[in-house]
Amino acid sequence: MEGLVFLNALATRLLFLLHSLVGVWRVTEVKKEPRYWLLALLNLLLFLETALTLKFKRGRGYKWFSPAIFLYLISIVPSLWLLELHHETQYCSIQAEGTSQNTSRKEDFNQTLTSNEQTSRADDLIETAKVFVNNLSTVCEKVWTLGLHQTFLLMLIIGRWLLPIGGGITRDQLSQLLLMFVGTAADILEFTSETLEEQNVRNSPALVYAILVIWTWSMLQFPLDLAVQNVVCPVSVTERGFPSLFFCQYSADLWNIGISVFIQDGPFLVVRLILMTYFKVINQMLVFFAAKNFLVVVLQLYRLVVLALAVRASLRSQSEGLKGEHGCRAQTSESGPSQRDWQNESKEGLAIPLRGSPVTSDDSHHTP
């Protein structure tokens, strides 16, 4: 079991490393400057975290937070920023040109394979890999950027699944977290692909930066496990009042509401409303997802009110129960002594005449 945990921890971090290096390679291909390979140095933080986790935690995760996913975000997000900001090559050429290029690449690929039949098998594999890489480098840049976005979100979900769980989360809670991540990733991908496609957005560098900042901000929810962790509240919390009981009893729900309102749906709604009102970018999908974000925010706030009312009702019922219990005890303490006194007095009243006029056998048979 320990070996499997160790293997999962190491394999997941290697996948993060490879995907990050692919992103750095795309940046160097687009910018045509080898100095962008320095972005690969960000992976040194992931190397350090891997070594420390394998040595001190035996590959197991941490409670409430995943450093591996956070460092993976640090290593891949700058590459995606540079690819999105390099919008000069974001638009593909015409279909005819692309088709002719694909045909010529297929012919070159077949010729390469034919010429390599006379060489060794190792050389054949090397040449095939070179041709494959060359074909990848000629793919439309817009397709490459979208593909990196898609694989990035998939890596976050799969990596969170494969990483060993920490001590504060169960497998049932992990499955809930992964289901939440699937819906979140779909919304984030739609947000970036829908907004950055618009020509009006591309013509405004400030708006592009704002969208990328909101996108980066929304990614910070993936390293967190707080939205599914239930905290056991001690009995003393009830005596502290409403705030303590509210934040303790519904901590997971409050984190979920906060993430939705302040990290994802709330900021997404603001950006979409700005696009529709100020930049006059209106289409069917933009209106639909803006309405969806609005409904989610309203429903989350409604849920917050429902939870607050539930806690207040619980505290009120507990206080009424305590008052009723104290009242019963007070009535019992007041009525108890009088009843005992009455019983004692009745016993004494019956005993006095018996002591004052004792009955003897002679008196019982006396005749006047």
Swiss-Prot record:
Q: Does the keyword Transmembrane helix apply?
A: yes
Task: Please note every region of biased composition (Polar residues).
Answer: 330-341
Q: Which residues are glycosylated?
A: 110
Q: Which InterPro entries match?
A: Transmembrane_26 (IPR019169)
Could you tell me the keywords of this UniProt record? Glycoprotein, Membrane, Transmembrane, Transmembrane helix
Taxonomy, superkingdom:
Eukaryota
Q: For this UniProt entry, what's an example GO CC term?
A: membrane
Q: Where found, per UniProt?
A: Membrane
Question: Transmembrane ranges?
Answer: 4-24, 36-56, 65-85, 150-170, 177-197, 208-228, 257-277, 281-301
Q: Where is this region: Disordered?
A: 324-368
Membrane topology is: Multi-pass membrane protein
Designated name of the protein:
Transmembrane protein 26
Source organism: Homo sapiens
